[in-house]
Amino acid sequence: GAGTIAETSVPQAEDFLWSELGGERRYQGDLNVWFSNQFSMQEDIPRYVPKNAADLHYFLHPGDIESVPRETIVGSGLDKDPVTYNDVFTYNLGYYRVENPAAPEAASVLILKDSFQNATIDYLSAIFRSVTVVDPRSYQETPDLASLLDADGIDLVLFFYHQNNVSRELIDFLSA
């Protein structure tokens, strides 16, 4: 197992490139869309990218050994107006994996998620050697949960869901 995550493994502010969305850029979050843009689009939204992002490797399918460009998984639409959640954070993909050979923790993590998790991948990939992300709502791959746990050498499973949003797809994925 991976053991306990040491305090020294928690990334610090200086480990990231920080920026604020808002101010000169309008940020249209999902909640604002749902409420017909009733909220300000000028709020400051923190955005951080690991300083070593160029050293991270992104994979789109289980078992892939050829990495894909970061923009395949993480939005790159900061030049849009307004900027949306998908322009800044990860897309709602059924599966992706991020490898960080220089991570302070050698653990491999599986995240079962909905869109609530999209903003956290850069932070988590700065900590763990491997972060495998599955969104059961759009997961189209062959490996079931047990196979993923084995194939990716998972040490830790995390659930990232909006409050009260446990989906039928998650239950089916866990039951398969």
Model-based region annotation:
Residues G1-A176:
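Extracellular glycan-modifying ectodomains
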